[in-house]
């Protein structure tokens, strides 16, 4: 399987705590080949992801068969378990965090490295560009095969693309149906050949899962409402993330590649809950 194919559906590891190792192994054995984590002990157990990767490698699923993404998380998103010296300059913080990630993951490279969220809203500030320059250096070293940013708005994306030497290759955002599934950022990413990853597709949109029309489409396709949402995301060019802890749901999630939504259904879902 190519790295491009690996990346078509990502398994997210936030909030798995001590179950992280077993769940990552289960996800990969169920068919996932892309894993997302972060060097943020407050919400992720990156070292336990590394344990899972080591166990999988021992069973014949090697690192080069997997697509691995982690993140640099600014100090405001961390608890007391910081992976860097908070008194150091930001460039040093990025380097320390990245080195710690490679150690946790028992890897010599990652496929994608993200800034977990900007320091400033609604526009980027000096700190964001300082961090980005450090990430560019990691990319140029070959230790990160791509770099990107998460939790970002359209204004920030425009600034980053226009002012950076190395343009972002990945964006990861939470998607709300009532914001047209982050259409402004998605369209910007498409125009600039940036891969768009969508998370919280189900948890942020419970009203969509229970919508009568979604249930009707699911019945017609002989799938679940959750599969309809994930298939919609994939079909509009999004890379969906799931964090399910249920083996049956993992397999159902990967079943989205076995059917296709009509143009009419796609239009309905894209505009289902606009406010």
How should these model regions be labeled?
Residues 7-19, 80-92, 120-125:
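Active-site mouth loops of central-metabolism enzymes
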Residues 64-91, 116:
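Structural motif corresponding to the early beta-alpha repeats
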């Amino acid at each position: 399987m190519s790295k491009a194919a690996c990346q078509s559906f990502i398994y997210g590891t936030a909030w798995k705590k001590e179950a992280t190792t077993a769940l990552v192994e289960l996800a990969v054995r169920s068919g996932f080949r892309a894993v997302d984590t972060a060097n943020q002990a407050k919400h992720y157990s990156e070292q336990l992801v590394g344990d899972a990767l080591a166990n999988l490698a021992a069973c014949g699923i090697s690192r080069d068969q997997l697509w691995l993404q982690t993140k640099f998380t600014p100090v405001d998103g961390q608890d007391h378990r910081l992976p860097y010296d908070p008194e150091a300059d930001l460039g040093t913080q990025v380097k320390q965090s990245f080195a710690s990630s490679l150690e946790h993951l028992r890897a010599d490279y990652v496929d994608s490295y993200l800034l977990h969220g900007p320091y400033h809203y609604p526009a980027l500030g000096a700190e964001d560009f300082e961090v980005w320059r450090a990430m560019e250096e990691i990319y140029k070293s070959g230790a990160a095969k791509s770099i990107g940013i998460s939790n970002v708005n359209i204004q920030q994306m425009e600034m980053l693309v226009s002012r950076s030497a190395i343009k972002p290759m990945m964006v990861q955002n939470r998607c709300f149906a009532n914001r047209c599934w982050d259409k402004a950022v998605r369209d910007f990413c498409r125009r600039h050949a940036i891969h768009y990853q969508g998370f919280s597709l189900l948890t942020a949109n419970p009203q969509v899962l229970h919508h009568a029309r979604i249930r009707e489409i699911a019945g017609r396709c002989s799938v679940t409402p959750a599969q309809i949402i994930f298939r919609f995301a994939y079909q509009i060019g999004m890379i969906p993330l799931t964090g399910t802890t249920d083996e049956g749901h993992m397999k159902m999630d990967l079943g989205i590649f076995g059917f296709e939504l009509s143009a009419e259904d796609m239009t309905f879902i894209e505009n289902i809950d606009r406010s």
